[in-house]
Amino acid sequence: MSLERTVVMLNEDDTQGRPLADLVKEAAKSIAPLWPISSFIARHPWMGLEGELFADAADRWQQVYGIDLYPPMTVFYTALKKGEIDPVFVERRLQSWLDKQSLPVPRHEAERLCRSFLWNDTVPEEAFSLPEMAQLAEGTQLRPMAVQPISKRLDQIAKRLDQQMIKWCKLFYDESGGTWTLPQREQGFYQAWRQLVVTDPSLSKDERKRFSGWPHDKHEALNYALEKLGIRDEDVVAYLEAHLLALPGWAGMAVWRSHRAGDEVGGLIDYLAVRLSIEWVLTAPHLPLHGEENGERRDVLPLLAAWFYWTGMTPEDWRRLRTNEQQARLAFADRFWRIDRHHLWLEAWEDTDEAKLKEAVSTRHRMSEPEQVAAQLLFCIDVRSEPFRRHLEAAGPFETYGCAGFFGLPIQTRVLDSEDVHPSCPAIVDPRHEIREVAPPEEVEPYRFRRDMFRFVSKTFKKMKQHVLAGLLLPEMSGPWLGLHTLARSAAPAWAGQVIRYTKKSVEQKPKTTLSLHYHEGDETTGLPIGLTNEEQVEYVKQLLVTIGLTSSFAPLVVVCGHGSETTNNPYASALDCGACGGVAGAFNARVFAALANLPSVRAELAKEGIVIPDETVFVAAEHITTVDELRWLEVPPLSEAAQQSFDRLKQALHDVSRQANAERMMKLPHVGGKPRDPVAEAQRRAVDWSEIRPEWGLAGNTAFFIGRRALTKGVHLDGRVFLHSYDWRDDPTGEALARIIAGPATVGQWINLQYYASTVAPHYYGSGDKTTQTVTGGIGVMQGNGSDLLAGLPWQSVVSSDRELFHFPLRLLVIIEAPSYYIERLLNENSEFRRKVENGWLRLSSIDPNSGAWMKWGDTHSLSVWSREMGIGK
């Protein structure tokens, strides 16, 4: 790509005459919604950029905002030394890339330069030894074509602007229920801020005076600020984008609030109106700015030295080139050094990883299938289920299936006697029904009394802590109790955790509940119908069973396993729960699906459609606790004789399965010191130890999403790195089930993958830093200290095993589909969004032919050809 092309790309967006909301919506593509940390949902930080090639987005992000979307070269070289990258794939990727480029120089010259860049992280000192080098570089400069905020060119003012925004955002977005809240919050962020800012003591008298006559309408204020700052129409989108990326966490919270309120950009207009209004007030005395408008020029001396040193070009050769030829060479070298070499190393790493996975699947030891399956278990696709499923299948005549952990139920849930509801489905799915826990009224009343008594202590403590006068007395009153609590939690965490759980359970004594499965009128507050109609009950059960290929040969016992986690003193607890259930445990959904599948009316209708569930088959609900790899029973209805035998056999096997799965998992955690003597006890200690920063690895290490029959991967040690979604193409002649998997679970898997990827490659920006120095703020998220951006990603401890070693491999998700090639072609032709992800390199796609076993690679991040099958993988 030439320098001239770069200039055109960054200035081609003509915004003149477009409505303000459209401009804000366009700028908002640069950020992603940020959910409150209490229901942590993996977010794809670049979901608005998927219309661009991954490499082009990385180029723009680095040039304009200084954000790297690739791992540093040291990470690639370390992976190479460990055998995680095959150098053959590096060379193969280089040749493929060169074949597709319009090169500004002869092929052999470009190849020498690029290969040198690939294998050297710095230009050697001797390359700068030519005396005329500096003189040649002086007249040739490159600079990033960026539209930067006015305030960013005034360093101290930029810091003050961020401090002001953090202060006001903390006040407005607070959900902690504090005693003192921001007045007039109900009128919106801009209105509440506008009425108070004129008395803000952190602003000088002159700065407060500048707000005199400032618009009270947010739309007028944003337009007025852009005008006063002198932003040209064609630069407005880029200017707003830069402001959103200055504090992407708080801006992401504004996006989430807007979406929750049903207003796509209203909250962002509020946010930007406040930010740009403050910016003008702080920068007004310095306007207009003179000098470089779009940032500092970049020195090209290292690039020039590289050309001379690695290609053999001489100063005389350089002088004979025309100016545009010099620019083209420098732009080529600059882009390859900053972006393309990283991209080729990343692709080579991904190719190596895929080749290893292909070999493992192709050479697997085929486990003998049991003559009669005792139990079938439905697990979430979560990568943490893979080791547990593998050990369970080896322990007896048990089959496992994988599906999204919400079990295809678009519901919001309300636990017994609660005013709160939770959307227990993926963030990309809108709830259509509400399911409630219910119990006899005579049992609910005493339960409410006991529960409220237990909560009263916590609420009183919180209110006293937030009260001006009571807060002074609190340390004296609570000191002895908190001292004992601290001692117990620190010296005997396992014992203390058991005592606290037992006490809570004993005091509350929650009655046995049933579920509101059957339809009746909608709720007054949410408008959603409570329960499901008979047709909906049948459809949801059928849809899941068909999708995972479980339509016949039912075992006497079918276990529906949600999953959750147990940790202590962990702000990121919800990040370890089920993402498909909106960041909470999947127990509720498991109970609902099992109950639906046991309904005689549902089974009768399913039988009419060819899905015959035997009378002896019973569905039961369980929960896989990933922190301790334990299966806990949630609801076990009366069992048939055959189901009871299967149940007893499964229970007997679970102890060893848990021990083996924990042993495998504990060995990956740092500071365990090899294989622990009692892996179950070690896992349980980590779950209740409030000083433990890594109770488990979560979904770190995820790299692939497999869609196909379990028989293809059964017995393969996938190391807890692969999402496993059951699918049988033979039960899906129209491809509808595959399309649902791609649109739902696979998309969520991609979000999770890119959340971990971003937190690994740009931890300072997309991660959340050191877990031990974080502060929970406003009940919505975490900050570093008491005045930072709202941190949107994962803590450093979630992706690294030490300060010098990554645990998570930053690879883009590989989706593998077991289906004939025409299924994949149909999917790509009908699903333009998924096709765009593949074409532009935001995920990778391969397929396995179910008849021949051939492994086929689809798509290419440079050629944009969905049908390319190259790189030698699967041939």
Swiss-Prot record:
GO terms for cellular component: plasma membrane. Belongs to the inorganic carbon transporter (TC 9.A.2) DabA family. It is a peripheral membrane protein. InterPro entries: DabA (IPR018752). Forms a complex with DabB. Zn(2+) binds at C380, D382, H563, C578. It comes from the Bacteria. Its cofactor is Zn(2+). It is found in: Cell membrane. It comes from Geobacillus thermodenitrificans (strain NG80-2). Keywords: Cell membrane, Membrane, Metal-binding, Transport, Zinc. One of its GO terms (molecular function) is zinc ion binding. Its main location: membrane. HAMAP family: DabA. This is Probable inorganic carbon transporter subunit DabA. The gene is dabA. Part of an energy-coupled inorganic carbon pump.
